[in-house]
Design a protein with these regions (language model features):
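N-terminal Lys/Arg-rich, disordered targeting/topogenic segments
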Residues: 1-2, 269
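Solvent-exposed, non-transmembrane regions of membrane-associated and secreted proteins
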Residues: 3-244
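C-terminal single-pass membrane-anchor helix
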Residues: 233-269
């Protein structure tokens, strides 16, 4: 009886340890796979819209952005303003505006309205009150996501970005390229570097820093440049997982199962 009990305990310990070991890898893979599907669904929705409908939505967003420049308290929205904001660039009704690709760190993530916690857990949030991601002179789009989650990479490696690196916003039929020109660390409530600058087309990515402490905010700002790179087929993390990693995980699981079965048979003799 004691032998069987010790075997059961050994199995439970093994399974628990293996689960803890594999959770970050498996969870991040699952989230990346989900992101790939979300982006594919978004692309399908865009393909079904007429050019006229897509242009009409872009025009609405451009008009909205024009009204922000004169709104000093634009980062604090009333209920009616929030409702109007959420109705823009929302073709499929999910709140997805488009998606961002960052080749330097292998990121391809959906962009949603607001920076609510539920959004930042799974993708990239658009800071309400900042310019919508359609570009144009006198605009400043601000996007955010979490860093250091065990379940998803998201903006975990944003600190690897350097001046000169380029990231892309895919919104409706547009692919907007931004080249990093400024990197800063600020207090959580410091919006000074997020202001609209006359004549400039800017986009800032931000996340928490330092890693695991999260007392400040890392800002990575880019200015609009000509899109000369063919990066439309950037492979999402889920599709480019190293085969050696997958093989190692499968091998470890099979070895563990085989070892447990061997111990059970040996004790049963």
């Amino acid at each position: 009886m004691r032998k069987h009990m010790s075997t059961i305990i050994a199995i439970l310990v093994f399974i628990t340890g293996l689960s803890l070991l594999l959770y970050p890898t498996v969870s991040n893979y699952w989230n990346s796979l989900h992101q790939s599907r979300v982006v594919a669904n978004y692309s399908d929705t865009m393909a079904k819209l007429s050019k006229q409908d897509k242009q009409a939505e872009i025009d609405r967003a451009v008009e909205y952005n024009s009204s922000l420049a004169s709104n000093g308290g634009r980062f604090t929205l009333s209920e009616s303003e929030l409702s109007e904001y959420k109705s823009l660039l929302n073709a499929d009704g999910t709140g997805m505006m488009g998606y961002i690709t960052i080749p330097k760190i292998g990121v391809k993530l959906a962009i949603y309205h607001t920076v609510d916690e539920s959004v930042l857990q799974v993708g990239v949030g658009h800071l309400e009150g900042s310019s919508l991601p359609v570009g144009g002179s006198g605009t400043h789009c601000v996007l955010s996501s979490h860093r250091g989650l065990p379940s998803a990479k998201l903006f975990t490696e944003l600190d690897r970005m350097k001046k000169g690196d380029v990231f892309y916003l895919h919104v409706y039929d547009r692919v907007l390229a931004y080249q990093v020109d400024n990197i800063a660390i600020v207090e959580p409530n410091d919006y000074g570097l997020l202001e609209i600058e006359e004549g400039k087309d800017l986009c800032t990515l931000f996340t928490c820093t330092p890693y695991g402490i999260n007392t400040h905010r890392l800002l990575v700002r880019g200015h609009r440049v000509e899109n000369v790179m063919d990066e439309k087929n950037l492979t999402a993390d889920a599709a480019r997982v190293n085969p050696l990693v997958v093989a190692s995980i499968i091998g470890l699981i099979l070895y563990g199962i085989g070892y447990v079965v061997y111990r059970i048979k040996k004790r049963g003799v």
